[in-house]
Structures are given as C-alpha cells and as structure tokens.
Amino acid sequence: MAQLKITQVKSYIGSKQNHRDTLRSLGLKGINTQVVKEDRPEFRGMVHTVRHLVTVEEVD
C-alpha cells in the first residue's frame, strides 16, 4: 500500500485551534518534522485541512 510522507513547512502560530489539533494528531511537532502515514482517506482529509502548513509526497 502507498504511504504519504508529510512534512510541516510552516509554523502553526496564529492558526486556528483545529489546525493545531490536526497537526498534533498527525504527529507533527514543529517545522521540518516528518511523519510517514498510510495513504487512507482519514489522513488525506487531515492533510487537506492543514494543506497550507505541510507538504506531502507519496512514498512506496
């Protein structure tokens, strides 16, 4: 199954609380932190919520 490499590229300071909660749920704790998650609709939805703060790459 494909995986997503999610990298936080911008700070969450000044963003809404639900965006902060989403970053925490993804496991991102600061700028330039990376996590690898399964490519599932739940994670795609989370990434869509914070798309202005993260970058996403597909990894096999």
UniProtKB/Swiss-Prot annotation:
InterPro entries cross-referenced by the UniProt entry: Ribo_uL30_ferredoxin-like_sf, Ribosomal_uL30_bac-type, Ribosomal_uL30_CS, Ribosomal_uL30_ferredoxin-like
UniProt xrefs under Gene3D superfamilies: Ribosomal protein L30, ferredoxin-like fold domain
GO CC entries: cytosolic large ribosomal subunit
UniProt key word Transit peptide: no
UniProt record similarity statement: Belongs to the universal ribosomal protein uL30 family.
UniProtKB keywords: Ribonucleoprotein, Ribosomal protein
Coiled coil feature spans: none
GO biological process terms on file: translation
Name of this chain's protein: Large ribosomal subunit protein uL30
Subunit structure: Part of the 50S ribosomal subunit.
NCBIfam families associated with the record: rpmD_bact
Species per Swiss-Prot/TrEMBL record: Streptomyces coelicolor (strain ATCC BAA-471 / A3(2) / M145)
A Pfam family it matches: Ribosomal_L30
An example molecular function term from Gene Ontology annotations: structural constituent of ribosome
